[in-house]
Amino acid sequence: STPLYSSAASDVYKRQNQNRKLFKKKSRSNYKLGCIITIVILIPVLYGVYLYCQQFNTQTQKSNEPQVNTSSQIPSGRNLEIPVSLAPKQEQIIRHTGYTVSYNKDLKLPNWVSYELTRQETKGKEKRSNRFIADPLAIGTIATNADYTRSGYDKGHMAPAADMKWSPKAMKESFYFSNMCPQHPQLNRRGWKNLEEKIRDWAIADSAVIVICGPIIERESKTIGKNKVAVPQQFFKVVLSPFVKPMRAIGFLFNNEQATDPLHSYVVTIDSIERLTHMDFFATLPDEIEN
């Protein structure tokens, strides 16, 4: 009976050994499968943790940086060029290549003219055209050369031709009558011209300036010519250097008469010009700059 028992035991041992091998094989397969599943699950989790850390580091860096009050940041360009009217007036806003004009068809004058002059633009070589023509975009009656003939007044540029040398089109448009006002010859050729030259110097020094200028008209104004072009009593000009720190702004006021005094004689606060014109210039500027 002993051999029979030994044979049976041997068979059992073999089966157990095979089962153990099969179990180990399955265990290894299950282990590999589990590892793969774990890796697949961990990849997006780890990536999410990475993104969170990056975001946290960025926020930490920003919190350690000097804080800038964005509400005090001053917009540039045409946002600053357009004054805010504080009283109703007849106007048509016309945007030309080199300047923007608020044209008043009743007065046959601009209410105001504004433009930005950059350092690069002062280097222009375009020649002066001297051809005064009607603004094709202006609606209503507009002045003509005949209105100024023997009137005793110059056709005074608001946006100067010398500031438009950077473009043939800008130069041509600077001679539109919508950009002209009747000016005393010794204002146009002296004080007003001297200020235009000084502003070009500022544009070069400060990289750019924004200029707004125009006439000041009383209710009962003298007129010239068949088209009854109003003759201003005064002229204003406000200038802003928006890219210097601190920003600078200055105002000038001229009577429409001979102007031969030094330029500083005509300096006034921008606030005082705003009261005269019923307009708000550089509306986003702090009051201390305008004063």
Model-derived features with residue positions:
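Single conserved hydrophobic/aromatic residue that forms the stacking wall/gate
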Residues: S1-Y13
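Domain-level detector for secreted/extracellular nuclease and nuclease-toxin modules, and
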Residues: K14-N291
